[in-house]
Structure formats: C-alpha cells, structure tokens
Amino acid sequence: MEKIKDSRFELVDQAKLNSEVVVRPNISYWKDAWRRLRKNPVAMTALFVLVAIILMSVFAPILRNMDYETVVTAKKNLPPNSEFWFGSDGMGRDLFTRVWIGARVSISIAIVATLIDVVVGCLYGGIAAYCGGIVDEIMMRIVEVLNSIPSLILTLLILVVLGNGYYQLMLALCITAWTGCARMIRGQILQLRESEYVLAAEALGASPIRIITKHLLPNTIGLIILEVASTIPSVIVYETTLSFLGLGLSIPAFSLGSLLSAGQQAMAFYPYQLLFPTIVLCLIILSFNIFGDGLRDALDPKLRQ
C-alpha cells in the first residue's frame, strides 16, 4: 500500500478557513418571491397595465369631468373626436367616461366577490380539515351537492328572485364560487394539521378557531394569493356575461358587460361603441391572467432552490 506523503497536506488556520466560506444572505419567503416576480418581465408588464387600468378607472372620469348620464340627442353616435375621445353612444353620452366607470364597476364587483369567496372558502375548508371525521364528511358532501348544481342556473334563480343590483349580483357570484377554494384549503390543511407547531398550540390549550386562523391559514397564504389572482378574472368574465345578456346590473347602473351589449346592437354602423369596451375588457382579463401565472411561478415552493 502506497504511503501518503506529508507534502500532500496543508495546514490551514481558522482565518483562512473562514475566508473561503461562501455566505449566502438569508432571504425570507416573500423577498425571494418578490425577487422572482421582478425577474419576470411579462408578469411585471401585466402588473403595470393592471395598475394603469385601475388608476384610469378611478381618476379618468374625475379628470375628464364629462356628464355620462344626461341624454343629449344632438350629440348621439358621434365618432371619436376632441370632445368625445371614445365617441358618444346612442344617447349622446361620453363613451370614454362610461367605459372607465364600467371598468371600475366590473373590477370592484369582482374583487369584493372574490374576497368573500376566499374568506368563506378558507374558513369552511379549514374547519372541515381540522375537525376531520364525520364533520369533514358532512361538510364535503355539502360542497359536492353545491357543485352538482349548475352555477349559471343558481345565479339566474337568485337574480330573478332578488332582482338586479350590486349586492344581488355579488351574492349570485359568490353562492357557489367558494367551493373550489374550500377544497384547496382543506387539502393543504390536511397536510399541516399534524405539524409540531399545531400540536404545541393544542397542548397550550388554544381553541380550534384560533389554531385555524392563527397557525394553519397563515401557512397557506401563498395558495390564497394565487386563488385570488386566478378567481378575479373569472368573476369579471362571469359578471360581464350576465350583464351582456341583460341579467346583471339594472339601468341606470352599468358595467363593461352592459356597454358591450349596447355596442353590439350598434356594431354595424358605429363599431367604435363596441371596440373600446372590448379592448379594455380584454386588457383587464389578459393582464390578470398573465400576472397570476407570474405569481404562481414566484410563489410555488417547488421552484425554490
């Protein structure tokens, strides 16, 4: 057996050893997710477009200061010009102002309905997963029954019974949409239920509601954010479809779907009345979907090093 020579070894002191250690800064989950998101130019562009649309929907009608409700027959169906930037509709109202107000209404309804969906779904799924047993079985069977009912039929039934309005429309949009979130949260909490910090909280006498809201749900915040980002565009499309069919908001209230319905009737002679609401709606849906995909890539733990 060959003898190992001492010349092959080198005595290294502690100072030199420390100098060769590569120290990686400690980055939190959210900082790492934000770093990943910033490196995605497509998602950041979508975020910029979303912020611009929201700012326009809030401030454009104020800065424009045009009457969007009074009927002026002398100025009806005017093409885009210096006075009416998007033209005027069949009643002489400023289409630019109406488009951005309609966008504000559609986005606000979608955001509120989505938040209600997520809150109800998180609590429902969290309680079902934490309690387990017969409670979980009963609660999940209720979810399956609701999913078996066509959501469009249930939505139309609510709108027919309660009438058309902001609150009625939000209730109709929320009545079954929360079930998907409940299933997702239930599956995640089933994995977290046996964690050490949950067992420690139980040993300290924490109530089930406190454990769910303070320990379990905060550890699913990434999934909740993704659920919000993916649900908002779906709700906007659903609300727009209902309003387009005349089943959404009642006159004089309007949204992008109402403007699309009115523009479709005048499309043959005044195509701009359909064009501008369509462009704004497509930008909103596309931006939300692209930004949601970027968020998913940034928050997915499987992509983390």
What residue ranges belong to the model's regions?
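Generic hydrophobic transmembrane alpha-helix motif, especially the helices
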Residues: 85, 89, 95, 116-191, ...
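Short alpha-helical transmembrane interface motifs in multi-pass membrane proteins
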Residues: 15-16, 105-109, 124, 136-140, ...
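Alpha-helical transmembrane segments
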Residues: 56, 178, 182, 231, ...
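Short helix-capping/hinge motifs at transmembrane helix termini and TM-loop junctions
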Residues: 60-68, 129-133, 158-164, 176, ...
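Transmembrane alpha-helix boundary and packing residues in multipass membrane permease domains
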Residues: 53, 126, 156-160, 169, ...
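Glycine-rich helix-loop "coupling/hinge" segments at transmembrane-helix boundaries
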Residues: 159-161, 173, 188-189, 230, ...
